[in-house]
């Protein structure tokens, strides 16, 4: 989840109240966020530069607060403070309005058809009469960075541009041109660059080079102009220096270019609802008309409040508490959601919720129910056992088998689901036939593939515990991962049971006895084999027959057949395999697929 850094004193001033750290942690928890760390700005710098130096008493305290990923409206101090003020009932829910502007005076953004080749959408808005101080200005910039990193997916979906409107002249145009046709002075630079030159220039920039791939291979680059052909920005890379906002900026023009229109609307709404509080007319935003080449035009931002009806029973039953309509509406008000009792045609009591443009996370009755639970307090919800609780058959069988094998004096181990490619195949004398699920970008060679069997983990466990007295008897019941084209993700989990005996002798008879015991407790009878190796009533029980698996010693291994289906193998582990895992003593091993028995 994203984390924001806010000055403690500024936050408390915005809340209109000071808190001890313990009390503030309680407030955060009750609101559904978390105080992650308490530090200072200088301490952060010292940590980054690895400097050992004592902290000064006058250093500003910084709170690092973890924010839910679905709440972009909380990604800056201003948005967080506003939400907390409403939560502690020190402020009413803001009402956002569009400025009343005549058709002939509204700012225009004209979109050229070429933009469809690279970044087809743009949404805009204006904040009039904004008052910036240094802290608020920095927060305004930080909010853009946080949005870029999260909902904008590192600018690939949406790129935000903010400009001093007084330095520009409308109407504006959004175009897509060859990079050689675009020239402008970028932000924090003094000379003009051609767009293709700018791409090369920023390849050495630690911050901007990670965004270049979004457009650098495109034949056209997106660019925004005003009526005097002054470049506003080259999204998603950099804004122009001409329209850079400063502490003296009063009128801010915000444009968001995007490949995802829905995300662009959310980002724009987050920006304007958070900082319209500091406009000359509080919570009023000036709209911009965006006109496309097909003649269709749209007014942005879309500040419409949409309504949602949620049955009261859904809320109370899901949470597990009994609440009246008045209590629910009061709790929702604390979460910035206006609510009232709905007029229902049937006898069912429902809550009508008015979702403001700042709450893009409220999409379903579940979201409303969650907000009621947060405001009510999770710690206040009585614990109870769900009436419908029932373990899955597979998990219930797994637990019973764990107990039974433990009573056979085997110790349970839990090993990694990931292993090296070599452990999956070569170290088990198996050939690689592209049958393993591979990790795309492994951090370590030890974790580059999903295990296809439990054998590597158990052998590694014994190999690392050779110094302990023998015999070693261990088992594991866990999942392995197989390629599976029938699944939408291309793979599926299978629950396997494995046991290993390591001692002075191979212990083959002990592993064979464990197989028989497992089948006995599962009420699967052993089948009598005829002279022609055909069992009687094959579908009613189990039998074993000679197998030829490379990880086992030839002639000292067997397949387990249950109800006519092969479910696993057991035998004496091949000396080469033991040597690969640095095991000097003989071992016998069993592995079977539990799910195949069900």
From Swiss-Prot:
SUPFAM superfamilies: Class II aaRS and biotin synthetases, PheT/TilS domain, Putative DNA-binding domain
Keywords, in A-Z order: Aminoacyl-tRNA synthetase, ATP-binding, Cytoplasm, Ligase, Magnesium, Metal-binding, Nucleotide-binding, Protein biosynthesis
GO-annotated molecular function: ATP binding; magnesium ion binding; phenylalanine-tRNA ligase activity; RNA binding
Cofactor(s) the protein needs: Mg(2+)
Official protein name in the record: Phenylalanine--tRNA ligase beta subunit, cytoplasmic
Keyword RNA-binding set for record: no
EC assignment: 6.1.1.20
Chief place of localization: cytoplasm
Entry's family note: Belongs to the phenylalanyl-tRNA synthetase beta subunit family. Type 2 subfamily.
Quaternary state and interactors: Tetramer of two alpha and two beta subunits.
Gene3D superfamilies reported in the protein's UniProt record: 3.30.56.10, Bira Bifunctional Protein, Domain 2 (3.30.930.10), Phenylalanyl-trna Synthetase, Chain B, domain 3 (3.50.40.10)
């Amino acid at each position: 989840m994203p984390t924001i850094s806010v000055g403690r004193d500024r936050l408390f001033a915005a809340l209109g109240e000071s808190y001890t750290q313990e009390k503030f942690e309680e407030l955060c928890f009750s609101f559904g966020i978390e105080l992650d760390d308490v530090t200072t700005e200088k301490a952060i710098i010292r940590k980054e530069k690895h400097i050992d130096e004592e902290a000064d008493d006058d250093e500003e305290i910084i709170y690092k607060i973890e924010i839910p990923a679905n709440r972009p409206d909380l990604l800056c101090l201003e948005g967080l403070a506003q939400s907390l003020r409403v939560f502690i009932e020190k402020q009413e829910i803001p009402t956002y309005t569009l400025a009343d502007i005549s058709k002939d005076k509204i700012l225009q953004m004209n979109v050229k058809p070429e933009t469809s080749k690279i970044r087809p959408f743009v949404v805009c808005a204006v904040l009039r009469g904004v008052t910036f101080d240094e802290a608020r200005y920095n927060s305004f910039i930080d909010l853009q960075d946080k949005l870029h990193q999260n909902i904008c997916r590192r600018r690939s979906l949406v790129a935000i541009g903010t400009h001093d409107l007084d330095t520009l002249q409308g109407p504006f145009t959004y175009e897509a041109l060859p990079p050689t046709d675009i020239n402008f002075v970028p932000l924090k630079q003094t000379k003009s660059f051609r767009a293709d030159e700018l791409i090369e220039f920023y390849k050495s920039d630690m911050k901007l080079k990670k965004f270049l791939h979004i457009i650098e291979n495109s034949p056209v680059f997106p660019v925004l102009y005003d009526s005097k052909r002054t470049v506003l920005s080259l999204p998603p890379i950099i804004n122009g220096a001409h329209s850079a906002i400063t502490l003296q900026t009063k009128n801010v023009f915000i444009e968001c270019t995007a490949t995802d229109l829905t995300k662009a609307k959310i980002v724009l709404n987050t920006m304007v609802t958070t900082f319209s509080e500091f406009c000359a007319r509080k919570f009023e935003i000036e709209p911009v008309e965006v006109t496309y080449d097909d003649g269709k035009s749209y007014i942005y931002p879309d500040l419409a409040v949409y309504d949602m009806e949620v049955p009261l029973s859904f809320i109370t039953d899901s949470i597990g508490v009994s609440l009246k309509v008045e209590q629910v509406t009061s709790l929702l008000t604390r979460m910035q959601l206006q609510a009232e009792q709905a007029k229902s045609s049937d006898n069912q009591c429902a809550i009508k919720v008015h979702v403001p443009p700042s709450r893009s996370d409220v999409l379903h009755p579940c979201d409303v129910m969650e907000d009621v639970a947060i405001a009510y307090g999770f710690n206040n919800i009585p614990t109870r056992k769900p009436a419908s609780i029932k373990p899955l058959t597979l998990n219930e069988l797994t637990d019973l088998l764990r107990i039974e094998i433990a009573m056979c004096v085997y110790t349970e181990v839990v090993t990694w689901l990931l292993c090296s490619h070599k452990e999956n195949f070569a170290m088990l004398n198996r050939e690689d036939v592209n049958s393993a699920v591979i990790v795309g970008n492994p951090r370590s060679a030890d974790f580059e593939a999903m295990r296809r069997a439990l054998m590597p983990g158990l052998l590694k466990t014994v190999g690392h515990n050779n110094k302990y007295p023998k015999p070693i008897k261990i088992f594991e019941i866990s999942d392995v991962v197989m390629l599976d084209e029938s699944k939408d993700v291309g793979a599926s989990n299978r629950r396997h049971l494995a046991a290993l005996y390591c001692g002075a002798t191979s212990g083959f008879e002990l592993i064979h006895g464990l197989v028989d015991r497992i089948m006995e407790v599962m009420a699967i009878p052993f089948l009598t084999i005829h002279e022609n190796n055909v069992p009687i009533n094959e579908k009613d029980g189990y039998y074993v027959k000679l197998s030829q698996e490379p990880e086992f010693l030839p002639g000292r291994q067997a397949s387990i057949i249950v109800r006519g289906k092969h479910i696993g193998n057991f035998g004496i582990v091949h000396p080469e395999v033991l040597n690969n895992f640095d095991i000097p003593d003989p071992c016998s091993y069993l592995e079977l697929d539990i799910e195949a028995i069900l």
